[in-house]
């Protein structure tokens, strides 16, 4: 887990406050207080993706990021308020005064039996929607960043979006391997209400900033997008009387949005070699040595060097899902074989090689550039990637017709990016996905897992799970998806042992010829028989 270099291990956030910067300086910082108290009371604003109230920063143990409430928005009626409106905010006057001054929204949810006032810090809502990585933390406080760095065109007839990332853009190309970040880009550029919400951050800053004694400061606020039909999965705490609830962290978002049917994204790095005569000249360019993400530290002072690729660091990102995602295509431009290619080579390891900077990269910067944050993609891609599971879907059909099975749920999710591995992508650069299907037979329930092998890289057996708890399945499935990538596209059997016991999971071999889709009906039925047999041997 990446660390904030300035602070001690296992410190808990107790207050997130105003943004500030010295007059004439470009970089923004944000006040943050911890328990135990730390000498420094601020960090870079570009570190915001790591910060939420009550979160333990620089944790030496794995944190479980599980929601304890789900807020369903039947309407978008949010009242502007301050966090002090939440009763029992803090027993410490200093925290109560500073945290209480921060902006919030209040949403009232009513059931036949109770009424709850949800207090949602405005910065936390914006962090979950827009400020998902260091790049967006910088660009939101500029009126021109997106217009200068992206060229976007929408074709109404085809319901098709074109996003061209311009050569001058500082958007980290590694973030384009995070499928949820790409879907968020599509959402932002295709929905004017969403773009208006994002741009309102800069408008609120201009209207409400203060300058005193050479320091510019601002209490964060913005206009939220319409949220009707959304679900927020949150962690927080209730007031003593249980009538109010303070959202400390938004763990996940279910967004009711119809994204364009297809989106093409182009970036200067998306290149394919063009066949032809001529030679290619490779020139080595020095970069920082490779250090695992968990050993990296984010520096609060030093600048970032533009000569190194911006390293994208996922740090326990929260998740998001869209009701109708977009099918993403990467537009690749051919390059001639005689073209000169700049290749990054690792520099000699230095004692500061584990320090990185989320400052905007520029010439003369001291440290390697980094971008921290991201989003886990919890979108169900059943319809978009259905063709990758044609044989598996035929298996399900046989289970239903011949073995009286009932399908309880189907979901197709992308495999996440883990470390520097690229196995979460297929050969063509599209997301690799995994399908989970809940099945019931004779009163018993089990889950089938099938990994996308459409590019022929590797074909895993069908996994049969029993003893799955619907309450923990979302978290279990996230661990399983990461485990598949960490295990180099193998089943993470030690993880399955932990989750369901050694007898709670079985592998079922595919019929021969499945990769070429040349399987007889008899062999398909044999596959289904093995699935049923394994389920009943648990």
From Swiss-Prot:
Query: Which terms are listed as keywords in the entry?
Result: DNA recombination, DNA-binding, Plasmid, Transposable element, Transposition
Molecular functions per Gene Ontology? DNA binding
- Can you supply a Gene Ontology BP term from the record? transposition
UniProt entry tagged with the keyword DNA-binding? yes
What species does this protein belong to? Escherichia coli
Coiled-coil regions in this chain? Answer: none
The taxonomy runs: Bacteria, Pseudomonadati, Pseudomonadota, Gammaproteobacteria, Enterobacterales
DNA-binding region (UniProt annotation): 311-330
- Is Membrane there in the keyword field? no
Task: Supply the name of the protein.
Answer: Transposon Tn7 transposition protein TnsE
Record region (Disordered): 330-360
**Pfam family name, one:** TnsE_C
What job does this protein perform?
Answer: TnsABC + TnsD promote high-frequency insertion of Tn7 into a specific target site known as att-Tn7 whereas TnsABC + TnsE promote low-frequency insertion into many different sites.
């Amino acid at each position: 887990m990446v660390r904030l270099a300035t602070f001690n291990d296992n410190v808990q956030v107790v207050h997130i406050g105003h943004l500030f910067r010295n007059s004439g300086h470009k970089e923004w910082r944000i006040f943050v207080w911890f328990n135990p108290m730390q000498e420094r009371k601020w960090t870079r604003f570009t570190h915001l993706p790591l910060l939420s109230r009550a979160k333990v920063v620089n944790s030496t143990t794995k944190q479980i990021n599980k929601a304890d409430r789900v807020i369903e928005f039947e309407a978008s009626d949010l009242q502007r308020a301050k966090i002090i409106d939440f009763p029992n905010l803090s027993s410490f006057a200093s925290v109560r005064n500073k945290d209480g001054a921060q902006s919030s929204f209040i949403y009232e949810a009513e059931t036949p039996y109770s009424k709850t006032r949800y207090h949602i810090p405005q910065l936390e809502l914006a962090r979950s929607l827009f400020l998902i990585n260091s790049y967006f933390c910088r660009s939101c406080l500029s009126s021109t960043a997106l217009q200068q760095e992206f060229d976007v065109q929408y074709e109404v007839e085809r319901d098709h979006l074109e996003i061209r990332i311009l050569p001058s853009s500082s958007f980290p190309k590694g973030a384009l391997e995070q499928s949820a970040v790409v879907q968020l880009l599509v959402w932002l550029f295709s929905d004017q209400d969403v773009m208006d919400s994002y741009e309102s951050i800069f408008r609120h800053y201009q209207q409400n900033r203060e300058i005193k004694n050479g320091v510019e400061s601002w209490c964060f606020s913005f206009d939220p997008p319409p949220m009707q039909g959304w679900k927020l999965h949150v962690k927080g705490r209730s007031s003593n009387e249980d009538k109010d609830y303070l959202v400390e962290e938004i763990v996940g978002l279910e967004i009711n949005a119809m994204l364009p049917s297809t989106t093409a994204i182009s970036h200067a790095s998306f290149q394919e070699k063009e066949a032809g005569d001529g030679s290619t000249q490779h020139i080595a360019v020095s970069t920082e040595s490779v250090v695992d993400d968990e050993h990296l530290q984010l520096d609060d002072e030093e600048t970032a060097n533009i000569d190194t690729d911006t390293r994208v660091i996922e740090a326990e990102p929260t998740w998001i899902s869209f009701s109708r995602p977009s099918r993403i295509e990467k537009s690749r431009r051919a390059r001639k074989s005689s073209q000169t290619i700049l290749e990054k080579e690792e520099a000699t390891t230095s004692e500061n090689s584990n320090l990185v900077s989320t400052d905007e990269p520029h010439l003369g910067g001291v440290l390697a550039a980094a971008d921290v944050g991201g989003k886990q993609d919890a979108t169900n891609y059943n319809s978009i990637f259905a063709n990758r599971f044609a044989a598996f879907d035929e298996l399900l059909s046989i289970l239903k017709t011949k073995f009286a099975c009932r399908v309880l749920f189907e979901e197709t999710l992308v495999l996440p990016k883990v470390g520097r591995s690229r196995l979460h992508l297929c050969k063509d650069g599209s997301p690799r996905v995994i399908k989970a299907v809940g099945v019931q037979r004779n009163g018993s329930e089990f889950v089938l897992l099938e990994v996308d092998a459409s590019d022929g890289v590797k074909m895993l057996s069908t996994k049969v799970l029993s003893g799955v708890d619907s309450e923990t399945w979302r978290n279990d499935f996230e661990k399983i998806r990461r485990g598949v990538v960490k295990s180099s596209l193998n089943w993470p059997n030690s993880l399955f042992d932990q989750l369901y016991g050694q007898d709670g999971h079985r592998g079922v071999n595919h019929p021969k010829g499945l990769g070429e889709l040349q399987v007889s009906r008899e062999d398909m039925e044999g596959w289904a028989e093995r699935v049923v047999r394994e389920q009943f041997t648990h």
